[in-house]
């Protein structure tokens, strides 16, 4: 089966010079996702950390200039939302969705490969007579595949929860600093529909 691959680039507004981490490593600005990266998400986690730092972690600082209620502040808030925050949230959501789709495919492929119906069950008996370790190797392969699937599903669930917490906290901060009566999470959902 052909490998799925998708590339994401961090929004330019996040790549400012004050974004440095310990170890002085260069900041990754682009990531190409594959199934292997979903199974071992260390690079994805680093990329998500950069995205989260550039928006949700520093939102109060970015909105400090917009505290006074006026039409100028509201326009600045809208510009910040549409040019920085919502694209950032959309990238993060797409990354998590990609790995979720890969997990679904992994489960379906593993279930298909190891179903005990038809000729594959007979083949296992024949293989067991020829190679006494074949059944054990098949079981180990099956367990490893399900372990990878479980790891990806847990990572997806974990990151969906993190995103839920971050977006609801950011929504609350936006209501305090921009427009109190707007539902920013609904606006984000509409932004995603308009930009897919």
Give the residues covered by each predicted segment.
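Non-coiled-coil alpha-helical tracts in long, low-complexity regions of eukaryotic assembly proteins
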Residues: 2-131, 140, 184, 189-196
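Charged, alpha-helical coiled-coil and adjacent rod-like segments in eukaryotic scaffold subunits
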Residues: 123-196
